[in-house]
Each structure stands twice: as structure tokens, then as C-alpha cells.
Amino acid sequence: MTRCTADNSLTNPAYRRRTMATGEMKEFLGIKGTEPTDFGINSDAQDLPSPSRQASTRRMSIGESIDGKINDWEEPRLDIEGFVVDYFTHRIRQNGMEWFGAPGLPCGVQPEHEMMRVMGTIFEKKHAENFETFCEQLLAVPRISFSLYQDVVRTVGNAQTDQCPMSYGRLIGLISFGGFVAAKMMESVELQGQVRNLFVYTSLFIKTRIRNNWKEHNRSWDDFMTLGKQMKEDYERAEAEKVGRRKQNRRWSMIGAGVTAGAIGIVGVVVCGRMMFSLK
């Protein structure tokens, strides 16, 4: 698929869309304590097709644009089920386990899947406490239903600034949370069988909203990759700065300890000297 290389000026619609999407990504991958924790859906009304997308005289397939091109989120290799399966498997393996009942990936692991792993991991690190709380809500019943799943992800806060009901940040949050819960399920023999249900619920929840909203809001996996790389670089840079500050603080603490020890040594010498003179 070819991609236009339009000038990124403030008057360019594509630039404005990308700026909005970047803001969404930063909002959901931001510093803990400053960002909303909503990666659910505010209301069903948002998922309904808008009047601007009424059926035309010629019936078009879902995802097909006016010029006849197919959006990348309709490509088989980028089915949302593949993202969910890959991330669940990846997250479960992080806990030293295997999801032997995982569906296969007909097209194999894609670069977009690998980027989702990175983004999902970052998201979980920044929302670990919230994940624990929401996971407890979801696992409070013996068997998870789709209705319960929807209720839980809808009550994960409220991000009123989102323009798209399935923004990139919300997408990352849902898959990351699903992987976290799946890993928890695998730790219990009684819950292992429900990982498959969680996979189905997560895939259905996301896929429906992508189909209903991504075309209108000009979202794509291509843009996801571009923004994901930016966020990954920003995160790694911030982490490197933290490590640098910690090392510097340790050096200063060691210098401080050395100065203190030296001062104590000097005081000791002076005191001992005075004692020796007094004995004479």
C-alpha cells in the first residue's frame, strides 16, 4: 500500500490527525499519577456508525475506501485476533508458562505484533496497581461472561479527551490488560480454561469498535507503528535518564560518605593527640 508523504504543516489534515493520535498515545503511556486510566468505552452510542457513513448506492465491503483500496486493518495478517493471541502468549510466557491452547497465527508473528508487545509492557508497568484492581473485579466470579467483561473495561476510569472510541492508547490498554489477566488465569488450574474465553471477548470488543470507528477517524496500523516507534524511543530515553540520575545520586552519596568518614578520622586524630599530650 502506498502512502502519501504530505507536508506536515499545521494546516495539513493528516498532520492534525497524527498530532491528535500522538496525544492519545502519550495520555495512555504517560507518567503514572497524571494520566486517566480509562481504556474502556464510554457508551454504546459512540460505537454506532455516524450519519456521515451511511450506505452508498454501491455496497462496499467493510474497510474499503472510496478509491477502492482496502484499509490495512482489514488485511488478514493484521486481524485483531492475531494481536490478542500473540500478546496473551507473550505475557503468559513472561510468567514462565505456556498457553498450549492458543490459536495459531496463519501469517506468523508480524512487526505490528512485536510493537504491541513493547507498548503493552510499557502500559502495564505504568498501570500495575490499576490492573490488579480490575483483575480482581473480573476474577471475582467463577466464570467470566462477555457482559461482565464489558462492565469491567467500561469502569476503568473515563478519558473524555478521546476523539476516537478505539484510540491507539485504548487499544493498547485493552490488549495489555487482557494479557495481564490471562497470565493470572494460567496460575490457577480452575481458571486456565477461561483464557480462551477472555481471548474471544477481547478480540470481539476491539474488532467491533475498530470496524465502526477507525475509518472515520483515519486510524491505521501504519500510523500505529509510526507513533509506537516514537513512544518507544521516548520511553527508553526517559528510562536512560532515570538510570543516569540514580547513578549520579549514588556517586554523590558515596562522596558524602567519604567526606563524613574523613571528617570523623580527623576528629579522632585530634582527640587522640590531645589525650596523648594530657598524659605527658
Swiss-Prot record:
Pfam families: Bcl-2, BH4. The keyword Mitochondrion applies. One of its GO terms (biological process) is defense response to Gram-negative bacterium. The keyword Signal does not apply. InterPro entries: Bcl-2-like_sf, Bcl-2_BH1-3, Bcl-2_fam, Bcl2-like, Bcl2_BH1_motif_CS, Bcl2_BH4. It is found in: Perikaryon; Synapse; Endomembrane system; Mitochondrion membrane. Residues 43-59 have a biased composition (Polar residues). Residues 33-59 are annotated as: Disordered. A motif (BH4) lies at residues 80-99. GO terms for molecular function: channel activity; GTPase activator activity; protein sequestering activity. PANTHER family: APOPTOSIS REGULATOR CED-9, BCL-2 RELATED. Interacts with asymmetric homodimer ced-4; the interaction sequesters ced-4. Interacts with egl-1; the interaction results in ced-4 release. Interacts with dre-1; the interaction inhibits ced-9 activity, either directly or indirectly. Interacts with dct-1. May form a complex composed of ced-9, ced-4 and mac-1. Interacts with dynamin-related protein drp-1 (via residues 280-502); the interaction is enhanced by GTP rather than GDP; the interaction is probably direct and may occur at the mitochondrion. Interaction with drp-1 may be enhanced by interaction of ced-9 with egl-1, but not with ced-4. This is Apoptosis regulator ced-9. It comes from Caenorhabditis elegans.
